[in-house]
């Protein structure tokens, strides 16, 4: 694989001050307000310029969206569309105290041995902040599934569990372990968006045979 793990992102604080000096989009109160991976900035700009860096959900006007920019060095904030519509003309101070360093990518891996070396790979993501459905629901279900399978085993297959950052985490795992697990994996499942209260669904592979 020729993917490159992005630099580690360190964030301390971020906010916007409106023309009256009121703090909005305060990262310390809701970390969804900041576009993940935003570059540092400390600048006073016009409302027109600010709007180029604001993200909203017009169809869900009370909600704050989650936005990332891992491969495009920029900055931005996320606010509700209702708040966006009520912004007044004037000068806005934007402040982001962040840094990008050569750090590390961490993922969790655990194998539950079976009667054969053939494996079932079960993965979930752990990279989105503050969200129960498109984040925490998957890892929680994965942990309970491991506990259930361990208590009812041994099983025919070896079950390998992986919790990692979405996309780049899976690429890092395959880069490190792909040659070892590629020949033994019989099937794989990604547990995602399991906490939204509706019926669970199974999404097939691109070929439609899994």
Show where each model-derived region lies.
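N-terminal hydrophobic/helix-forming segments and targeting peptides
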Residues: 1-210
